[in-house]
A protein has these predicted regions:
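Short hydrophobic/Thr-rich beta-strand motif most characteristic of the beta2 strand and flanking loop
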Residues: 36-43, 51, 112
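Active-site beta3 strand of CheY-like receiver
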Residues: 56-62
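C-terminal output helix
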Residues: 116-125
Length: 135
């Protein structure tokens, strides 16, 4: 799917992508690069928590659930406890019974299942990052 450079414009916004799968990272980078958002990465929940503590410019986190060291649910709980204003969009390929409820209880703002449709991903993020006049 193609979109113009102005369809989704998040210049000045920082998106942290927390994902341990290299293929998913390539997809997210390709999907988000035209948005002009500053993209940063963490390979697991523990790294994400540390990065958020050090970088107060993060506006939105795209968080995987199943990762080593610290899973996305616990990372979400910790980050939301420290910085409730950061938007967290959880994305996962595994739908276990009650998993979405656990994510919501941990504080996630959105829950997306893989495979992720590009337009749905961009529209979801845009709800949080677009300037008021753009929504």
């Amino acid at each position: 799917m193609e979109f113009s450079d102005t369809t989704y414009s998040w210049s000045g916004k920082t998106v942290l992508i927390v994902e341990d799968n290299e293929t998913s990272n390539i997809y997210f980078e390709a999907a988000l690069r035209k948005t002009k958002a500053n993209l940063v990465w963490a390979k697991n929940g523990l790294d994400a928590v540390e990065m958020v503590k050090k970088n107060n410019q993060i506006n939105l986190i795209l968080m995987d659930i199943n990762m080593p060291k610290l899973d996305g649910i616990e990372a979400t709980r910790i980050i939301k406890g420290l910085f409730p204003e950061i938007i967290i969009v959880v994305q996962t390929a595994f739908i276990l019974s009650g998993e979405e409820r656990l994510c919501v209880d941990a504080g996630c703002d959105e829950f997306i299942t893989k495979p992720i449709r590009l337009k749905y991903l961009l529209d979801t993020i845009n709800r949080y990052l677009a300037s008021p006049k753009e929504t």
